[in-house]
Regions:
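Charge-rich amphipathic alpha-helical interaction elements
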Residues: 1-130
Length: 130
């Protein structure tokens, strides 16, 4: 009984952790996209002020050149985060499925559970340790 309760709590924790990770990725994506947009607006203002849009021109504004590099770096980071989002979303779905299975097992009363009490105790200790 105790190990099943702990297993259920563990599965809840795993779902919460995966949800937090996915939310963090989404938050970072939104922030990076906002920053890239702001920098692009500043680049446009600098180019308009200088009247030069050719990056290779000798009089191209230094700030605009540096901001353009920063936008490229942000776009690379955005692409990396998008690549990380799909596996994080998949991990969340898997954790939710495991939680659902554990809840169903708990609802059935754990029938068919013929584990050795010594093994259950070891599993419980490992869950407590980490």
């Amino acid at each position: 009984m105790k190990s099943r309760d702990n297993l259920l709590r563990l599965k809840h924790f795993q779902v919460q952790e995966k949800t937090r990770q996915l939310a963090q990725i989404d938050m970072m994506l939104a922030e990076f996209e906002r920053m890239a947009g702001d920098l692009q607006n500043q680049i446009d203002v600098e180019e308009k002020k200088a009247g030069i849009t050719d990056v290779s021109h000798f009089a191209y504004p230094t700030f605009a050149k540096a901001a353009r590099t920063r936008v490229e770096n942000l776009e690379n980071s955005i692409n990396d985060l998008r690549e990380k989002r799909a596996p994080a979303e998949e991990a969340l779905k898997e954790a939710e499925e495991e939680l659902r299975k554990a809840e169903l097992k708990e609802a059935r009363g754990g029938s068919g559970d013929t584990t050795d009490p010594v093994v259950e105790e070891q599993i419980e200790r490992r869950m407590m340790i980490g």
